[in-house]
Amino acid sequence: MNGIEVLCQYQNGRKSFIRNSLSRIEIIQSDLSAVDFSRAELEWVNFSGTNLSRANLHRADLMHAKLIGTKLISANLKSADLSFADLSWVNCENAALVRADLIDTNLSGANLLKADLTDANLSGANLTGVNLSGANLSRANLSGANLTGVDLSGANLSRVDFSNANFEEANLVEVDFFRAEMSECNLQQATLIHTTLKGANFSNANLRGASLKGVVLKNLKNTLSMKSEFNIPELSQSDRLDLSGANLSGANLSGANFQNCSFRFAFMQKANLYKANLKDSSLIEVHLKNSNMQSANLNNSILSGINLQGTTMPDGSVHQ
């Protein structure tokens, strides 16, 4: 069947196209709401601008599909294969994308408000400017994904793999990063206010200019920590956040709770640590030049080889 035949049959009352082979058909700016394409072969189709709200695309093969500006509101895309597809400016509000394959998919400008992406694979996907507010990405794979300027406020990102992902200027307010893999991430100028980072791994992440005011970091479990080169028992604990080698230069960390955190070899020049809780933390070979540590809690912290030139100390004095 070609696109015209499918559309005519739909308009005449047919809603089920289960397991149909419909590769390369073109149906643009039409109404296919509530259609059933479950398990259908839809590789290379062009549904740009079409209304597929409430459609059933469970386990459909949509590799290389063109869905630019398509409406997929409340659609069922569970276990669908959308790898290499173009979903730019798509509306997937409240859509179910559980276990969906979105490898190298273009989702720039997409609306994924409250979408369920649990266990989805978005490695290498382009998520620039996407609205993921309130979305569930629990256990999803976003390694190497581009999330520049993305809105993830209030999203559940627990146990998500974000290694090497780009979060530059992203809105991460009140996001749950519980046990997330954030190593090598770019979080420059990102906003992480009131964000939960319990058990997350930020090894070698770049948080230059990021705002982490009010982040929740205490009582961490099962964090992936870098192996210590120092024979210090405290560093072998499994319940600490690892920010080893992270770039926090210029970051606003005022009032943040970093208790029992490892900052080994971190770059924190000009960082604002006013009233930050650094109790029991490891600050070995940290660059803190010109930072503000006024009223910070350093009780029982390990401090060794630190560059404190021009730093405002907890008592208000400036280190020379």
Regions found by a protein language model. Name each.
Residues 2-320:
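Tandem repeat scaffolds
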